[in-house]
């Protein structure tokens, strides 16, 4: 609670220091962010399309890793944390393993990771989109299921990356409308 009060004070002070009519670079990029989001999601989908077939062909499992409960977390009060944790999960656990499965896809997986890092950076700069601290149970379930699948977990997680992009889109659409 104290950290949110401190954050509010810092935001207020920053706003007071900025001259009228001139927004800070961060404010300007946050104002443009909702308009840039469809382009960022399209870029993620385009890069993913280059590796989608590879991972979906290797995914021989019938279960779903990214379940409806994760989407519900994205849409609920834990949306911010669920999104943040899932981005971190893909960047730190899934993609480093995915890069090592075939030299032909390494560059594309790396590019996908860079696009995801850019999205995360923009979300963090615009605090209204990613102001969170709580843990998501649905994300924990995804991580546990991923771990249990061992090597097959990479194929499963990467083959469902398009679902993850859809969940990001649902979360951001909800945030933009609020």
From Swiss-Prot:
PROSITE patterns: INTERLEUKIN_10
Principal localisation: secreted
One Pfam family per UniProt: IL10
GO biological process, any: negative regulation of interleukin-6 production
GO cellular component, one term: extracellular space
SUPFAM superfamilies, alphabetized: 4-helical cytokines
GO molecular function, one term: cytokine activity
Similarity field: Belongs to the IL-10 family.
Quaternary structure and partners: Homodimer. Interacts with IL10RA and IL10RB.
Primary role: Major immune regulatory cytokine that acts on many cells of the immune system where it has profound anti-inflammatory functions, limiting excessive tissue disruption caused by inflammation. Mechanistically, IL10 binds to its heterotetrameric receptor comprising IL10RA and IL10RB leading to JAK1 and STAT2-mediated phosphorylation of STAT3. In turn, STAT3 translocates to the nucleus where it drives expression of anti-inflammatory mediators.
Protein name: Interleukin-10
Gene name of the encoded protein: IL10
